[in-house]
Amino acid sequence: MAITQNLINQVKEKILQKISHTYLFQHIQKPVIDDERLLLILSILQEAKLSDKDIEKYTITTMLIQIALDTHELITNESCDKDLEKNRQLTVLAGDFYSGHYFQLLAEAEDIHMIKILAEAIKEINEQKIFLYQKTAANLKELVESIVIVEHALLDKLIAAFHMEKWKDLSSSILLIKRL
């Protein structure tokens, strides 16, 4: 399977089908699918010589997790009126809705190993987000390292799982630059 714009569009369409919910989209902003991250995941998995079915499955599940994490980042803690409070609650539910699809896809495929791999990435991301929110970085290097983990942990786990270490530096650099 060559990575073409057509393939990228097909995968994006399948992701949108998974996350599409009329009521949610009426009240919260529609999630953004990160094209660069999508292309990196597709490239890594394709080079790992996985089947087309597995490439699609792992790309979609990884992107669903990223969308869920990104959606949760939109939640604010500031006080607000009832309409904004409803929006905040729906944003939390949307993030949970998107991540639920990740579990469902891998569970249906009985891919417990990948559930564990991606769950470990989610754990690392959330630990680093807590670290960043606490503002306990001792220096700039620590701060950047935490940001890299937040941005790259999902890909890092895929890279390790499929022994594609040559992608690690490039993909982490691309995602860090995008974040900064």
Feature-to-residue mapping (PLM):
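Mg2+-dependent prenyl diphosphate-binding active-site environment of isoprenoid biosynthetic enzymes
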Residues: 13-180
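N-terminal amphipathic/basic leader segments beginning at the initiator methionine
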Residues: 1-12
